[in-house]
């Protein structure tokens, strides 16, 4: 941690690919008349429980499934129409999940929302409205926001950090939100700060986004408790641990939560959703998705109704160029390849990347040459090659002894490896094995 230069040790510099969509304003994408799919697990924790049945008519913004436990989240319909079925459907991850299927009638009849003024808000009202709206972390993890804002020791929270780094290559949705709706992002942060008595706000933005930094500095000029911190452009600067260390100098490990270091981290779109839910009274039924890559004709940033089919996202961007080689949900470093586009956009869907053949690497891995580049790139100061070796031998003891469970699966080691070894994938698989074995005990 170096004062005046917000960064962390390790990381890498992948080609950022943001020129495809960074200058494209957010465009609203109305869903086509027809089937909308709402999975009951769009968040970390217990699946939501349906409160509608087949044949029911629902309005846009209506609650269709309620939180199934303390760590869970409400789900609302983004459209008006009739419930066709409640059945398992495939997700972008490839897994199946029980889902509510609604036939969109194209009329978008909405429920009535109850707005509130900032001055009238109390801590309990803020948390209740966030919970009622089903707001979750929208950077991908999907942790319920009301739970994150209810730590065991609220007096210990010193900082609420807005993650505006957007360090994943190609993604530009947070950048566009900061440019176009800075006032609402600032208001969302002020609402979150109101829950804690002495917390300060930090908005971290990578220094390759000077326009966003300038706009947010102007938007916070009269806010003494909020500071905009330019971050050194490096991947994974937006990782929770890296961001906390870069902006505050505080370090956390896998046995700690950010709250243990006095910090709470929120994605830009999550903070925007806090504003929408608390001030305007609207539930989380839409999100921004970046559709980009050399495999689409017109890359852009779209404000998408949840439940919309990914195929419609591709059509909104002008359709594919030729025969794309690969579709990815999320970023190229931590996202996952998709085998089908017939899956719904959910709360954590940040993007659809479409790549042509010459961008997709098809190289074969070779033997490790002991160069040490993976260790230099690891933001957690691990030895990825050694951990991957333990994983390949299924050596759980060695893997945990050398802190394999501290891996944040950012992909930096695999990216820099000259032998093209799938280090992240091997470590990730071993982590899953260790966690599964711990649950058995």
What are these regions (language model features)?
Residues 349-365, 375, 379-441:
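Ferredoxin-type iron-sulfur electron-transfer modules in oxidoreductases and energy-metabolism complexes
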Residues 53-66, 85:
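Short, well-structured beta-strand-loop connectors
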Residues 179-194:
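Histidine-anchored nucleotide/phosphate-binding helix
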Residues 198-310, 316-321, 331:
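Hydrophobic alpha-helical positions that pack around
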Residues 85, 90-143, 152-155, 210:
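Acidic low-complexity segments
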Residues 110, 137, 160-174, 295:
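Gly-rich Lys/Arg/Thr-decorated short loops/hinges at beta-loop-alpha junctions or inter-strand turns
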Residues 81-83:
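Conserved hydrophobic positions within beta-strands
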Residues 2-51:
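N-terminal, Lys/Arg-enriched amphipathic/low-complexity engagement segments
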């Amino acid at each position: 941690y170096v004062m005046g230069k917000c960064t962390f040790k390790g990381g890498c510099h992948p080609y950022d690919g943001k020129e495809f969509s960074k200058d494209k304003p957010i465009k609203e994408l109305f869903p086509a008349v027809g089937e909308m799919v709402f999975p009951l697990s769009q968040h970390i924790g217990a699946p939501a429980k349906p409160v509608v049945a087949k044949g029911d008519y629902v309005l846009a913004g209506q609650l269709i499934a309620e939180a199934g436990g303390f760590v869970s989240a409400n789900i609302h319909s983004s459209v008006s129409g009739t419930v066709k079925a409640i059945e398992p459907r495939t997700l972008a991850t490839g897994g199946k999940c029980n889902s509510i299927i609604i036939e969109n009638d194209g009329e978008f009849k909405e429920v009535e929302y109850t707005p509130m003024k900032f001055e009238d808000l109390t801590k309990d009202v803020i948390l209740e409205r966030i919970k009622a709206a089903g707001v979750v972390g929208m950077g991908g993890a999907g942790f319920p926001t009301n739970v994150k804002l209810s730590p065991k020791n609220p007096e210990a929270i010193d900082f609420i950090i807005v993650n505006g780094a957007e360090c994943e290559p190609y993604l530009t949705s947070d950048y566009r939100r900061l440019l176009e709706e800075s006032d609402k992002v600032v208001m969302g942060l002020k609402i979150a700060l109101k829950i804690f008595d002495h917390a300060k706000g930090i908005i971290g933005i990578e220094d390759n986004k000077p326009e966003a930094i300038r706009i947010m500095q102007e938007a916070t000029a009269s806010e003494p408790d909020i500071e905009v911190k330019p971050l050194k452009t490096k991947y994974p600067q937006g990782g929770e641990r890296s961001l906390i260390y870069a902006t505050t100098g505080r370090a956390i490990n896998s046995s700690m939560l950010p709250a243990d270091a006095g910090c709470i981290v929120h994605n830009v779109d999550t903070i925007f959703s806090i504003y929408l839910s608390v001030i305007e009274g609207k539930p989380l039924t839409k999100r921004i998705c970046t559709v980009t890559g050399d495999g689409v004709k017109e890359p852009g940033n779209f404000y998408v109704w949840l439940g919309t089919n990914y195929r419609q996202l591709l059509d909104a961007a002008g359709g594919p160029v030729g025969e794309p080689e690969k579709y990815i949900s999320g970023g190229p470093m931590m996202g996952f390849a998709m085998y089908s586009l017939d899956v719904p956009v959910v709360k954590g869907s940040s993007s659809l990347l479409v790549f042509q053949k010459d961008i997709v690497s098809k190289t074969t891995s070779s033997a490790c040459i002991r160069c040490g580049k993976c260790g230099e790139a690891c933001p957690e100061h691990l030895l990825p090659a050694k951990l991957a070796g333990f994983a390949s031998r299924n050596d759980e003891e060695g893997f945990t002894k050398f802190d394999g469970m501290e891996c944040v699966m950012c992909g930096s080691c695999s990216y820099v490896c000259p032998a093209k070894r799938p280090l992240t994938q091997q470590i990730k698989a071993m982590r899953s094995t260790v966690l599964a074995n711990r649950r058995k005990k």
